[in-house]
């Protein structure tokens, strides 16, 4: 009878990040959405996981997938996966990567670190390599990245299979960290150049030691709390915002919006918004012609933002109710991703 993994409270996880360096390894948290078209550069998908698109032609995507009952991941109480799609790929001059950044380049340094995950595909395929990179951060004069290759030419079949790898990471004695506090250990799969593939993966496990420890899921609430340390999205699309205090010149309204994240940003903060607002007058929605967004107090627990919208001077002095324009969701993202 196969062993069935259980959901453990965090204090049973023996102990902290040495026991499991990966956050959201069973792909349960998807704050940014569940379907992604990947573009050149870094693309965050399921929380904490990112796909680095190095360029070239073709269609690349990522999407939430589900584990079928009876498949191997389900025996460990894993129900979700991610599927990475590469179609018609050509012209790549560098390798695409998919994985996660573990905060602190000291993780497992000078020790054996083991990595495990489920992999399967729609046909027999070959993954280029599994890599760990010790990245010493930015700012100042940090030491150059060191690279450890765990495996090359990883054979993947249509059956979900758990793969296990172990390597000894270099010591970081004598190395120099950057001054921005963003040093980390990056663990990622690296795709072969110009390789079309449809790859499923879940159950990521990274731990210090010479063997991959059994995958143990945290509760969804605990996993979300860990994800919120790095990224938080608040959707204001469906919310009516109270009429704000206004200041204007001949053609602009300024309105304050206060957003309180659930955590104190540890490294940096970047707010992004798609601020297509509309106002209501005489029972009808009226759109503003232009908007912009800025923010202040970014290092404080409460982040105060201000958006500016142009308006018809004839409406000045009315009471406004703010709402997202139809079909245009408004997000506020607070990120301290490495």
Q: What do these predicted regions represent?
A:
Residues 4-338:
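Extracellular and organelle-lumenal recognition/adhesion modules and their flexible linkers in secreted
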